[in-house]
């Protein structure tokens, strides 16, 4: 099953569940979601370091590891700067509507940010994010609805990281790319991030399918993407 088929199936099932409003079917869907999340958390993620270690052993043997690590450091630096720019931009737009200082709004969210650094999970950070959002003057009703909903679907930081890393790897490996192809990839990635599980590394695992089908990433390129993403997962 390719990625487009899986997405169409997911949307069809979602619309069907909503229209039928069957509690039994909804419970089945929730249980299946829990199975997938537990599989990623308990099986796939613990084994990923071994897989990535093997990839780096192979690169060391071929003499590529130093040049790749140097590129990694540059990519991480660029993405960190982009994260800061994105946060300042988003909070500046919000501050225009509420006539407040965006940096004061950002400073009140620092406890949530540091919690996310430690947990590497947007879902686990929800209680702290909710509390700090209320301290920023957001009503309890709005915060209680928006924060749990958007914590795991508004993955703008994950989208930014994956797009930047994919572009850097394609340029580094001399892979052909053009704007229409990458625009389609970004669009599909945005849709995929809506369904990405809110667990450490969940976003990159959800995006592997379109990295392979749309950009032609092989197993080694996917492993490099996973390694890059995991290294930056906590800060955005």
Which residues are covered by each model-predicted region?
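Small-residue-enriched core segments of transmembrane alpha-helices in multipass membrane transport
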Residues: 33-36, 72-89, 108-115, 183-196, ...
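Transmembrane alpha-helical segments and their short flanking loops
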Residues: 163-236
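Hydrophobic alpha-helical segments of integral membrane proteins
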Residues: 25-43, 69-72, 76, 102-113, ...
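Membrane-interfacial loop-to-helix junctions in multi-pass transporters
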Residues: 2-4, 40-44, 81-82, 96-105, ...
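Membrane-embedded alpha-helical segments of transport systems
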Residues: 3-7, 44-47, 150-161, 229-236
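Helix-loop-helix junctions within the multi-pass membrane cores of secondary transporters/permeases
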Residues: 115-193
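Alpha-helical transmembrane segments of polytopic integral membrane proteins
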Residues: 10, 49-53, 86, 90-91, ...
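Signature of multi-pass transmembrane helix bundles
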Residues: 1-104
